[in-house]
Amino acid sequence: AWEEVWICTRENGHLQATGIDARRRKQYLYHPSWVALRNQTKYYRLVRFAHALPKIRLNVEKDLARHGLPKEKILAAMVSLMERTNMRVGNSSYEKMYGSFGLATLRDKHINIKGNTLRFSFKGKKGVHQEISLRNARLARIVQRCKEIPGKELFQYYDEEGNRHSIDSGMV
């Protein structure tokens, strides 16, 4: 049973109820018509994304060729990793609340690089342990350079002034 329950006063409100479950997670109950509409919209967004994908891939390749470790290169490496491994992007709130990680929240300790092989090992969504391997020389070099940047976050970049910054999920 949920605690701290809120129930919509409108019969046709898109959000019908919210509450906190036994594991202290906020849960949402949506109106069935809203769910159907969102699913249909999701399909059309996916079609637009499919049409944009070739250009995205060209931009990723261009950004991977940049010198140094600028933000664009790190984001391109992350997009390439997501495409090749199907890794979720993750976000800091899930890390804080559940101790689970995604690509944007990985730490140096979650990656082992030997030659051209990257081995990711971390607790993912819903506490499922992830073991992901990938052979790619260019990505291995870039991720190794990221790992060498001071700080616990794996994916960081240097700006034009040489200042270090972390990547968050919204940037990806």
What are these regions (language model features)?
Residues 1-101, 107-172:
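A positively charged, amphipathic N-terminal helix/segment that binds anionic biomolecules
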